[in-house]
Amino acid sequence: MNYKNLLAGLAAGLLLYAQAGWHVALAAVPPDAPKDVKHILGFYYGNGENILIRENGGRLELLYRFSMQDKAFGSSNIYPLAKEHFDSYTLNEAGPMTSSESTVRFERDPDGYGISCRVGGHVYSRAFVGTTTGERGKELRFPTHSAEEWEQLRAQAVAAPMPDELAAGQQVELVDASTVAGLKIDSRYGQADNCFGAPLYTSEKLFVGKEAAAALGKVQQHLAAYGYGLVLWDAYRPWSVSKLANLALPAESKDMLEDPETKGSAHNTGNAVDVSLYDLATGEQLEMISGFDEPSFRQFASYAGGTSRQRYLRDLLREAMELYGFKGIEMEWWHFDFRPGTNWAHLNVNM
């Protein structure tokens, strides 16, 4: 048997299969949900219960969760809603012995936002979160500091010594992230438009470990076939900046970040990144399932709500990143660690 020809044939077959699958994936990108639909999607509460309204395949679905611990609504019962007319739907609950039918009606405010949902005789009120289309929640903003206070905090952070134990491990060579072809830089902590209301970095440049940068380049090439590119929101963070963030947080919020004195941040290693997607044709960032640093259930990587398109984009991003050595975390869909099993050294080099 000619194994060389056999292997060549198998390789060609796999290539054709991959290309076919690739085009299926390209064709399967869900269309965006209409704006009036987005305005009623989200979280509703009442009667000691919580429900979630999402769009799936062009239809609305009601998700009912049994446990408050199911923050992502991943174990919810899912009920398709059959549209009767504008904002009025029918929910059919069918079982092996019985079945029931309920009317589901949404009430909107004058601006078109859903504010309540009536399911049969029960009324659920809308809880707004985030600022993406259809939501009108508030962005996360910590109490602000004056310019003078920021300078004092920065000086205190720079003067603080990084614990020796954090410096142990494999050090990376940092490179300018802008050298990765096609990567869009949008340094959220290099600008004032973030949860601190002030830039934490002294520059909007972002740096990342050399190997991680090469992997980002491969992710960028992978996503280009879909018409998308990577947006880099954050990457290497000097330990002193993690210390600055900790000092700037109010006492009741300090547990929102890793303690810089004991654990530090994965971003200190140069191998953690916060990323999203942009449209290669327009250069515009895509609307994802939640905003950056949004402190809500929508930030979870397995969150079951939103629209089909939003979930598709989030999952596509995760799939592409994990294909090239990154690993996502459940808490934040935008955060990825490069080769997390490696003992990376924390760095305190100001770039």
Regions found by a protein language model. Give the residues of each.
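Bacterial N-terminal signal peptides that target proteins for export
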Residues: 2-10
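Extracytoplasmic cell-surface/polysaccharide-interacting catalytic and binding patches
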Residues: 134-233, 248-331, 339-351
